[in-house]
């Protein structure tokens, strides 16, 4: 995947796309490869294709979390988690741009449940209130 990133950085998007598709033939659940293909599609302004790749990457991560019974925080700051969050943010963007704001809000909610600190600013994408100002959210602490 590092070599593919070098190709993209060097302006060889078509070759990079072919390499990623070849990689997915052997490992269709490679979250990072789908995220990268989504980024290439987004660069080509193909929102539907980008949504497909970002959505598949997000689904891979979500299913892994569900199978693991993950509860609590999954911080973005850990490198192993970053592709999931980046794919989710890009998916929410694509969904919003395609007029699917309810689905975009569901993606944002999942990301915020995983890391409430919101390091990628997904809350701002849909004007989702911060937890402390949300109805039923934690009360502010005087101190």
Show where each model-derived region lies.
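Alpha-helical segment of the N-proximal tetratricopeptide repeat
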Residues: 1-26, 90, 94-97
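Structural motif corresponding to the intra-repeat A-B loop/turn of tetratricopeptide repeats
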Residues: 10, 44, 98, 132-133
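Residue at a conserved register position within TPR or TPR-like alpha-solenoid repeats
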Residues: 7, 41, 95, 129-130
